[in-house]
Amino acid sequence: MVASSTVPSVASIFAPESLLKKTKAQKQSREQIVAAAAEKKSARQKKRELIAKRAEAYEAEYRAAEREQIELARKARAEGNYFVPHEPKLIFVVRIRGINNIPPKARKIMQLLRLLQINNGIFVKFNKAIKEMLQVVEPYVTYGIPNHKTVRELIYKRGFGKVNKQRIPLSDNAIIEAALGKYSILSVEDLIHEIYTVGPNFKQAANFLWPFKLSSPLGGWRERKFKHFIEGGDAGKRDEHINGLVQKML
């Protein structure tokens, strides 16, 4: 076995010092690039694991909430009482009428709600201010309580984000993270959870979502579309029946 020599080679003796420094710098640069790439890969893997873990936790949370509602309803029936659900926190609003013959106040509210076109839809947090707005625009919209399936399918099938005032499809979690990462909303599932549960950053999440552009409902609107829902029309409050309508408009 030949022992390794520490004696410099002829090439290294006669190589200019600047070339030696350049070679050393290039080697260090390559090592740094490799290390940075490995670090990025590790960070991406950790993020994927975090997103998957959160999604599992959300699913367990949704199932637990559903079981609780079923149990409360069952208990109320057993005691001979009528089960009254909590007042909804989340409402989905759809514009069903065009621009003709809409009074200025109602038109202004439509603009505030970002319902600029017929068949536009938005999520809103239900509170006193929204309730008063909906009363004014009730002849021109329909609204109700979306379930988890509706929220999820709207965002996955018709969801677009507002990025630099542009309408961008939610084709990658990176788009959501770039806009909402500072609120710990990193993925589509995080966004769905924030909207559906009306979380602490609901306002930012809802404003990030571009108003949904829905199709006219499969089978068409009711014959007396502009009458109130309870009178056989489509306008106004329809509670859980909003879910069936949305399915026809996706």
From Swiss-Prot:
<dbReference type="GO" id="GO:0000463">
    <property type="term" value="P:maturation of LSU-rRNA from tricistronic rRNA transcript (SSU-rRNA, 5.8S rRNA, LSU-rRNA)"/>
</dbReference>
<protein>
    <recommendedName>
        <fullName>Large ribosomal subunit protein uL30B</fullName>
    </recommendedName>
</protein>
<keyword id="KW-0689">Ribosomal protein</keyword>
<keyword id="KW-0963">Cytoplasm</keyword>
<dbReference type="GO" id="GO:0003735">
    <property type="term" value="F:structural constituent of ribosome"/>
</dbReference>
<dbReference type="GO" id="GO:0005737">
    <property type="term" value="C:cytoplasm"/>
</dbReference>
<dbReference type="InterPro" id="IPR018038">
    <property type="entry name" value="Ribosomal_uL30_CS"/>
</dbReference>
<dbReference type="Pfam" id="PF00327">
    <property type="entry name" value="Ribosomal_L30"/>
</dbReference>
<comment type="subunit">
    <text>Component of the large ribosomal subunit (LSU). Mature yeast ribosomes consist of a small (40S) and a large (60S) subunit. The 40S small subunit contains 1 molecule of ribosomal RNA (18S rRNA) and at least 33 different proteins. The large 60S subunit contains 3 rRNA molecules (25S, 5.8S and 5S rRNA) and at least 46 different proteins.</text>
</comment>
<dbReference type="InterPro" id="IPR005998">
    <property type="entry name" value="Ribosomal_uL30_euk"/>
</dbReference>
<dbReference type="InterPro" id="IPR035808">
    <property type="entry name" value="Ribosomal_uL30_euk_arc"/>
</dbReference>
<dbReference type="GO" id="GO:0030684">
    <property type="term" value="C:preribosome"/>
</dbReference>
<dbReference type="InterPro" id="IPR039699">
    <property type="entry name" value="Ribosomal_uL30"/>
</dbReference>
<keyword id="KW-0539">Nucleus</keyword>
<comment type="function">
    <text>Component of the ribosome, a large ribonucleoprotein complex responsible for the synthesis of proteins in the cell. The small ribosomal subunit (SSU) binds messenger RNAs (mRNAs) and translates the encoded message by selecting cognate aminoacyl-transfer RNA (tRNA) molecules. The large subunit (LSU) contains the ribosomal catalytic site termed the peptidyl transferase center (PTC), which catalyzes the formation of peptide bonds, thereby polymerizing the amino acids delivered by tRNAs into a polypeptide chain.</text>
</comment>
<dbReference type="InterPro" id="IPR016082">
    <property type="entry name" value="Ribosomal_uL30_ferredoxin-like"/>
</dbReference>
<keyword id="KW-0687">Ribonucleoprotein</keyword>
<dbReference type="InterPro" id="IPR036919">
    <property type="entry name" value="Ribo_uL30_ferredoxin-like_sf"/>
</dbReference>
<dbReference type="GO" id="GO:0002181">
    <property type="term" value="P:cytoplasmic translation"/>
</dbReference>
<dbReference type="GO" id="GO:0005730">
    <property type="term" value="C:nucleolus"/>
</dbReference>
<dbReference type="GO" id="GO:0003723">
    <property type="term" value="F:RNA binding"/>
</dbReference>
<dbReference type="Pfam" id="PF08079">
    <property type="entry name" value="Ribosomal_L30_N"/>
</dbReference>
<comment type="similarity">
    <text>Belongs to the universal ribosomal protein uL30 family.</text>
</comment>
<dbReference type="InterPro" id="IPR012988">
    <property type="entry name" value="Ribosomal_uL30_N_euk"/>
</dbReference>
<dbReference type="GO" id="GO:0022625">
    <property type="term" value="C:cytosolic large ribosomal subunit"/>
</dbReference>
